[in-house]
Amino acid sequence: MGLPEIIIEFKTKGVTAIKRSARGIVAIVLKDDTEEGQALNIYKSVLDVDPTHFTARNYEYLKLVYEGSPSKTIVLKVGTAVENLNPQLKQLNDLKWNYLVIPGITDDEKTTVSAWIKEARDDHHKTFKAVLPNCTADHEGIINLTTDNITSTLGTTAFTTAEYCCRIAGVLAGLSLARSCTYFELSDITAADVPEDADERIDNGELVIVFDGEKYKIGRGVNSLTSFTPEHGQEFSKIKIMEGVDLYQDDIRDTFESSYVGKVINDYDNKQAFVAAILAYHRELEGDVLDKTFNNTAAIDVE
C-alpha cells in the first residue's frame, strides 16, 4: 500500500474510532474439568456457547461477560488442578484482546497476572488490561474491583468479587469512547456489599459499586494507578482516557506495520508523508478522544 492509501486508512480509522472502541474483546480463563469442547474457543455471542462444554457456574460467568456486549470472547479452559497459568498467558500474548478476566483466580495467580500485564504494557507496548479482584497494582493496566457479595439476576448464587470481574470486563469492552463507565448502571444487581467510604476507595485506585437508593452503579471509572509522574499524570488513572490512549497506540502501530514497513522506501519524504497522515488522523479524533484545545502533533525525531 502506498502513502496516499495510508492517509485514507488513517482518516478511516479516525472516523470509525468511536464505533470501533465499543467492539472490545474479552479474554477469559475458566477452570473447568468438563471433557467436552476445546481448550481454546472464540465466541461472538453467548448463543455460540454450548453450555454442555462448561460447568453451570462457568457458563454463568460467560453470561456475565456478554451482558456487557463485547464484540467477542476468547475463552481458555484449563483444569481445576492446574499449577499455574503460564501456558495460558503465553497463548494470550500472541492474540489480540482488550480485557482479561479469571473468575477462579487465586492470590498467587493474581500476582503473576498483574506482573505479566505490567510487563506486557511497559516493556512490550501491548495494550492488554485485566480486571482483577482486590489487587492494589498501582498500574493503569489493572482495574481493581473491590466490591463483594454481589447478588445478580444473572447468577444462581451471589458472586464474589473475582467472579463479578466478568461483568465489569464485559461492560468495559462494550462501552465506546463516547462515554465513561462512571455511574454505569448495573441493572442485574439486586444486592451488594457497597462501601460506605466510596470516595476514599476510589482515591486508592479501587473500582467500586455504589447504590444511589434505587440503582446499583459503577462508582467512578478508575484503574488502580495512584502514583503519578509527569509522564503518567492523574488522567492516566481514568479508564476512558486509557481506552483512548490504547486505541491510538494500536491504530498507529497497526497501520505502520501493515502499510509502511516494507511497502515504501524509508526516506525523509516518506517519513514526512506518514507524519502528515498521522496529523490527519488526529483531526478526526479531536473531541471524543483527543483534547481539541491541546496541540496534538507528531514529528520525526532526527536526533
At which residue positions do the language-model features occur?
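Structured, hydrophobic secondary-structure cores that serve as assembly/anchoring elements
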Residues: 1-61, 66, 179, 183, ...
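A general structural signal for short secondary-structure junctions and capping/turn motifs
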Residues: 17-19, 90-92, 199
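Short, surface-exposed beta-edge/turn micro-motifs
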Residues: 23-25, 96-98, 127-128, 194, ...
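Short linear motifs in intrinsically disordered/low-complexity regions
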Residues: 33-34, 51, 123-124, 139, ...
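Extracellular Cys-Trp
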Residues: 58-182
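Acidic, serine/threonine- and glycine-rich low-complexity intrinsically disordered segments
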Residues: 184-195
